[in-house]
Amino acid sequence: MGLVASCFGGLAAYAAESVACCCGSAACSLCCRSCPSCTNSTSTRITYAILFFLSSIAAWIMLDKDVSKGLMKVCCYHSTLFRLVLFTQPAIKTTTNVVPWGELGVMRIMFSVCLFHLFLSLCTIGVSSSKDPRSSLHNGMWFIKLILLVGAMVGSFFISNSFFIGASWSWIGLVGAVLFMIVQFILLVDFAYSWNDSWVGKLEEGSKCAGFGSYRLISATVMLMAFVITLTVLMFHFYTNGDCKLSNFFIGFNLALALLVTLTSMLPSVREALPSSGILQSSVVAAYATYLVWSAVSGVPSTCHPLIAVAPLFLSSRGFLPPLPYVALKPAECGGDAGTNTAAIVIGALLTFISVAYSSIRTSSKSQLGKLGLQQGSNENIYLMDDKAADFDEDDEDRRLQRVVDNEQDAVRYSWSFFHLTFAVAALYLMMVLTEWDSSDADVRIGKGWASVWVQVVSSWVIFLLYGWTMMAPVCLPDRDFS
């Protein structure tokens, strides 16, 4: 309960700090005088990312069934309204005949976050500049929005458990998670190409740092390939013992796909049709796909688990890492080892939030909307500009004051509606990840189970497929413009 109080206390503290900004720009300048000036298009996205991070921590804590059940009792059991909801709802049936309080807590938190961003997405449809009266819903009113978000989280505990356990919400969560994963995979491939184009472009310019740039390009490629090879060897050594034939297939097939896309990227026909193709992109895609396979095989419900990954357990026991309430630190009935799964969960949680934040911010820009096939046309009033290029006409004294400069008076820098829509499906994706893709079991250990295994394995195959198509499409369809 202390963790819950501290988490929601953090939200309350953050809300209190935002009250000053609600009172006017002078208060912000007084509180943040030493901070550099920034634009509202940047500060707004950062603020929403922080809110999503705090909400994710709250959902993480809710994985402890005792915390979720205790919060429900403290907040609602003494409420007459909740008594009516509790005693009139149908009984929950699970394989163990025990209510999955941890999963229910996660679903309620992410349900609130999803509704919050869906509401803002609907309210900001068609906004073309900050002069629109609806701009305050997106760039301001932070204290009110924080109250609404926290209120939605608390209010979600009054909703019948059968709503979250039922098939309808499960399908909604699954569809939203799959949509976010597709966007995430497209951005991963795009990131690989952008990274390669950036470094190769500097080499072709012939700058003084060209030699260092070549060293960076080669070093990054070698390090990523070394990561793929090392992790693959370790997986073959630790995860292919006994009757682990399926894990053996997953690892071997992933290695074959990695070699295939790497060799394909070096084919003369591919290089001619797509000059930007290279081994760096293949290494980025292969590294992420190999991580997904490792995370999958570490969650296979069998005896195919080594006694490794002691570091996360050691750091957690010494207080350097927060306790992970959803990880059972003992072998499960299936014979799996919790140490390996703990490492997969810690790394997976970090990568999940990074990808959520990156995807939510990147997909809202005009260039990314075009790559996703969602650009609204050439007349779309979205300017993709460098926020640092905003002109400041104020005097020197005002420049020393912290101000959030409105750089969207003429046109918005990104699609506000699609920005919130991405956060909404990101909340559903994180909900499905934390609930092991909604297994609806009471004693669930996150990351364990065939649903989680197959989702991650198939995801690795889809990434290879998307990347392979980006290389072969210009060859197979030379008349089309893929720029």
Swiss-Prot record:
Stretches that traverse the bilayer: 43-63, 109-129, 146-166, 169-189, 218-238, 249-269, 274-294, 295-315, 338-358, 414-434, 457-477
Mode of membrane association: Multi-pass membrane protein
Keyword set includes Endoplasmic reticulum: yes
The keyword NAD appears for this protein: no
A Pfam cross-reference name: Serinc
Record's subcellular location: Endoplasmic reticulum membrane
Record GO biological process: phospholipid biosynthetic process
Record keywords, A-Z: Endoplasmic reticulum, Lipid biosynthesis, Lipid metabolism, Membrane, Phospholipid biosynthesis, Phospholipid metabolism, Transmembrane, Transmembrane helix
Entry GO terms, CC: endoplasmic reticulum membrane; membrane
Function: Enhances the incorporation of serine into phosphatidylserine and sphingolipids.
Membership in a protein family: Belongs to the TDE1 family.
Protein name in UniProt: Probable serine incorporator
UniProt source species: Monosiga brevicollis
Source species taxonomy: Eukaryota, Choanoflagellata, Craspedida, Salpingoecidae, Monosiga
